[in-house]
Amino acid sequence: MSRRFLLTLLSLLLVVAGDSAAKQDLDTWILVDTRKMVLSVLEGDKVRRTYNDIAIGRAGTTADKKQGDNKTPLGEFRLVRIAPKTPFHRFFGIDYPTVAHAKRALRAGTIGLEHYIEIYRAIRAQAIPPQETPLGGYIGIHGIGEGEAAIHKRFNWTQGCIALTNQQIDDLSRWVYVGMRVVIR
């Protein structure tokens, strides 16, 4: 390979790595306001981007989500997965259930010690927590895919995720990175 090619390749890698590091260094995070039905991207405490008319779980929200309840979990999470092509257009998975959710569920008898330990170990290792426990899983932010925009605008229709239009999720993809903080309130 020529020296010029290698220098060009190195320059491109530095630009891409620098862009990713810049996103993380600015303390960029997501706030989902389920009362106002708005998702905002913030840098510190300054709002950089807002997406209106989001949809949440068809049964509302809860601090204590259970598998199949169609509710969006409340709390503080991290993005653990970025899938650019899914049936819902794009999917940005969060680390639900968190240790806080698992602790409350253990105290309430919703899960046993074995599930609590599995969730605790996964979160501690910064891995995706088990998704098949009685607390449910596969929660994230996604588009509507081939779904109807009119239904999205009028109804909360998800099984617990946060949904944006495909155009909104495409725009949001410029901001997201694995490890990004997501607050759902």
Predicted segments — roles?
Residues 8-15:
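Bacterial N-terminal signal peptides
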Residues 35-37, 44-46, 54-59, 82-85, ...:
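Solvent-exposed coil/turn segments that connect beta secondary-structure elements
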Residues 23-28, 34-35, 52-81, 123-126, ...:
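N-terminal post-signal-peptidase region of extra-cytosolic proteins
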Residues 49-52, 182-184:
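Short hydrophobic/aromatic-enriched beta-strand-loop microsegments
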Residues 1-7:
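Bacterial N-terminal signal peptides that target proteins for export
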Residues 2, 18-44:
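N-terminal accessory segments that precede or flank the first globular/catalytic domain
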Residues 25, 85-185:
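Exported/periplasmic cell-wall-interacting domains
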Residues 39-42, 50, 61-65, 87-90, ...:
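Short, solvent-exposed loop/turn elements at domain surfaces
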